[in-house]
């Protein structure tokens, strides 16, 4: 079954576009999107990659209950990248809709046979 692992970057940009956050909380916010199953190291690698490419910036912020946490923020370049992803996702949705319209008669014929 297909897993949306290639959607991790745009999902992180989306969440950070909504508000700055630290890694652990981003992992928690990704779960309802079906992006993270158990291996969180991919999330942290992707955050570092997005930061290296200038899509995010980060700094250390004190935590009320423990050590300081790295808080990530989206940059102007990250917002532009997010808009680019929007166009890609809209095109993907258009293609999937076309596929589903063609698939529907095949499924109906199979159940009717």
Question: Can you say where each PLM-predicted feature lies in the sequence?
Answer:
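Basic, amphipathic "hinge/linker" alpha-helix immediately C-terminal to the N-terminal HTH DNA-binding motif
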Residues: 64, 68-86
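Amphipathic alpha-helical dimerization/coiled-coil segments
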Residues: 80-113
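Short beta-strand "wing" residues that participate in macromolecule-binding interfaces
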Residues: 58
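Short polar/acidic secondary-structure junctions
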Residues: 35, 61-63
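N-terminal helix-turn-helix DNA-binding core of bacterial DNA-binding proteins
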Residues: 2-44
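Short, hydrophobic-biased segments on the C-terminal half of alpha helices
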Residues: 44-51
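Short secondary-structure boundary/capping segments
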Residues: 48, 63-64
């Amino acid at each position: 079954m297909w897993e949306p692992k290639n959607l991790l970057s745009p999902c992180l940009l989306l969440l950070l576009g909504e508000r700055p956050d630290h890694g652990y909380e981003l992992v928690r916010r990704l779960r309802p999107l079906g992006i993270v199953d158990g291996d969180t190291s991919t999330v942290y690698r992707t955050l570092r990659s997005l930061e290296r490419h200038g899509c995010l910036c980060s700094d250390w912020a004190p935590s009320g209950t423990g050590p300081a946490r790295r808080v990530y923020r989206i940059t102007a370049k990250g917002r532009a990248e997010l808009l680019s992803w929007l166009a890609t996702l809209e095109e993907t949705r258009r293609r999937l809709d076309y596929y589903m319209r063609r698939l529907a008669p095949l499924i109906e014929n199979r159940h009717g046979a």
